[in-house]
Each structure stands twice: as structure tokens, then as C-alpha cells.
Amino acid sequence: MIFKYIQEPVLGSLFRSRDSLIYLNRSIDQMGWRLPPRTKPYWWLYYIWTLVVIVLVFIFIPYGLIMTGIKEFKNFTTTDLFTYVQVPVNTNASIMKGIIVLFMRRRFSRAQKMMDAMDIRCTKMEEKVQVHRAAALCNRVVVIYHCIYFGYLSMALTGALVIGKTPFCLYNPLVNPDDHFYLATAIESVTMAGIILANLILDVYPIIYVVVLRIHMELLSERIKTLRTDVEKGDDQHYAELVECVKDHKLIVEYGNTLRPMISATMFIQLLSVGLLLGLAAVSMQFYNTVMERVVSGVYTIAILSQTFPFCYVCEQLSSDCESLTNTLFHSKWIGAERRYRTTMLYFIHNVQQSILFTAGGIFPICLNTNIKMAKFAFSVVTIVNEMDLAEKLRRE
């Protein structure tokens, strides 16, 4: 079953936290970013595939964009110009993020081991069902992103075929689009599909890993609510349960710290580029004459918003979860407990008050407010274009 990992929970086949990465890992495998051990048969084929992807995505596309600017810039129409300007911004941002993730990819395996450790504490059926639903949600997110991103590629390809121009104005030294239009369009679409898939992976992975973090925060909060509620248990058992909760929180914090450097670097690049991309997309709408061009631009705008808004929303929810966990811990039944329990509880409360936050480049917090501020830059781009009367000048030319 293709969509097995987005199904509702069924007893006997519940997902683990690690299963939230199934569809993401398949995409990573397609990009050649998970090299198999050399003990596996035909490992060298995958290494060749990885090399091909690196050459196409990280070498051919930047080269093609540079050569397009050098050779074809004087022949650009206004529509071609704004199509061309948007592609290098998004592509170069994706390449920089991809390089960062490739150098830090070992953090993924460490985080997945921590997922398994957190799952060990999920002994109740209710907890396992919640983990299953979180994993299914993460896989649904990957499917939705595929629909948005490759929907844009399909629309761009359709528009190119209707208009009679290659979709991304990418220079190809081997095939002349004027002589072999369909072949050039096919090559350009396949290579851009690689950068789009890379973009998808880089935009989705923070959402999935933080959603898993959130679900284990919620499960920890539920365990804290049950502390010292069973009158049949003795002080030693109550204390042991509290210690386990402290260990759970420590593991969750360590999980967040493992991912923070990678998320911080990639989101810094993304948040800086999203405002410029939205501004260029808004300006380009003024020059598109056909309905197809405007539809493609609209789908592209949705894809740009998908790069930052969902993760900023998840981080906003994570901040609320941290506050809720602090309140839950403070209002648990610890008053009247033995001294060692109260001492450990005070230590726990102090640590829990330090929220698990993600920042972009260690400069500004990743939240909805930051996303809105970066998106406002789009209005600045439009304002500059309008004040310079650039639209009318380009139309006259």
C-alpha cells in the first residue's frame, strides 16, 4: 500500500516515532543523500546516482543560471526577466541549505536514536496511539508538500508548453531550445525537479522532527499529571516516577539541542530569502499577460509561503507547550511530599522553565511574528518597484 503510513491507528500495527520519517527518508534516498554501507550489494550504483544528482543539482543548475544571465539577458522579455530573477534566489538558497544539511547529516541518526529512547517510555496504549497519529501526520505533511511543490513544477511545465518557452530559462550547452524545444524542456524540468525535491526535503525535515518533539512533550505532560495520584504506591515509587519524568525531559531537551544547529542555519537562509521571493512574485504578477502565467505564479507563491509558515507555526505551538508543561508541573501534587521529592521537583521546575526554542542563525526566534516581519519585506520590494515606476519603464521597453 503506497499510503500505508498515513492511515489511522490499528491495533497490532501502530507506528513508532521513527516511522514519521518514512516518506521523508524515501525522498532523501531519491536524492542520494543516504549512502549505504559498502557491504550491501550493488552499493556502487547508489554512489554513482549520488554523484549524478550532485552534478546536476549543485553544478549544472548554477552554471546554467549564470550562463543564462550572460548570454540571454539582452533578449529577455519582461516576463522572462522576472522568471529568471526568482529562480537563482530560490536555487542558491536551496544549495546553501543542502550543503549545511549534508555536513550535519549525522545529527539525523542521533535524533532518530533518541526517538527510539523516547518511545520506550510510551508503555500505555493511549500513548502509543498518540505517537502513531503524530507519525501519520508527519507523513501526510510530506505528501502535501509533494503536491504543492511538484504541482508548481507541473503547472510551470504546462505553461511552458502552451507559451512555447522553456519553463525556467535555464541555459543548456548541449541542446538548443529553438531547435529541440521539447527535449530542452524535458531536460530542464528533470534537473529542476531535483532542486525542487531537495527544497522539499530541506523545508519539511524541521517540521517533522519538531512535531515528534511536541508529541513527546505532550506525553510527558500527561505523565506529570499522574504523579502521586495513586494512593496505593509508596514514597519510593512516587519518587522513582518523578525521576523518570526528569530523565524524559532531559532526553527531550537533548533531542532539541541535537537538531538546533542544523535548523538554525537552514531557517536563517530561508527566512532571509522568503521576503525577497514573495516580493519578486508579487511584482511579476503585474507583467504576466496570460491566465496560465498568473496561475503558475500563484501556485509558486503558495510554495514560497509553505517554506516557512508551517514550521514557524509549529515552533509557536512548541513555545506554548513549554509554558503548559511548566504550569502542569507546578500544579502537580508535590506539596506535602517527602523532602527528596520536593527538592527534585524544585530542580525539575527550574529546568522546565527554560523553554526549548529555535532561533534562525542564533539571531531572531523562529515564530509567526518573525515570519510575518520577513514577509513584510515583500511589500518593500513592491513599493520600491512602484516608486521607481519600473513597471511602466519595462513595459515601454
Curated annotation (Swiss-Prot):
Expressed in olfactory sensory neurons in the antenna. Residues 68-83, 164-192, 284-294, 369-397 are extracellular. Glycans are attached at N75. The keyword Cell membrane applies. It is a multi-pass membrane protein. One of its GO terms (molecular function) is olfactory receptor activity. Its main location: membrane. Residues 1-46, 105-142, 214-262, 316-347 are cytoplasmic. Pfam families: 7tm_6 (PF02949). GO terms for biological process: detection of chemical stimulus involved in sensory perception of smell; signal transduction. It is found in: Cell membrane. The chain crosses the membrane at residues 47-67, 84-104, 143-163, 193-213, 263-283, 295-315, 348-368. Keywords: Cell membrane, Glycoprotein, Membrane, Olfaction, Receptor, Sensory transduction, Transducer, Transmembrane, Transmembrane helix. GO terms for cellular component: dendrite membrane; plasma membrane. InterPro entries: 7tm6_olfct_rcpt. The keyword Lyase does not apply. The atypical heteromeric and topological design of the odorant receptors appears to be an insect-specific solution for odor recognition, making the OR/Orco complex an attractive target for the development of highly selective insect repellents to disrupt olfactory-mediated host-seeking behaviors of insect disease vectors. Odor-evoked OR currents are independent of known G-protein-coupled second messenger pathways. Belongs to the insect chemoreceptor superfamily. Heteromeric odorant receptor channel (TC 1.A.69) family. Or2a subfamily. Odorant receptor which mediates acceptance or avoidance behavior, depending on its substrates. The odorant receptor repertoire encodes a large collection of odor stimuli that vary widely in identity, intensity, and duration. May form a complex with Orco to form odorant-sensing units, providing sensitive and prolonged odorant signaling and calcium permeability. Interacts with Orco. Complexes exist early in the endomembrane system in olfactory sensory neurons (OSNs), coupling these complexes to the conserved ciliary trafficking pathway. This is Odorant receptor 85a. The lineage of its organism: Eukaryota, Metazoa, Ecdysozoa, Arthropoda, Hexapoda. The gene is Or85a.
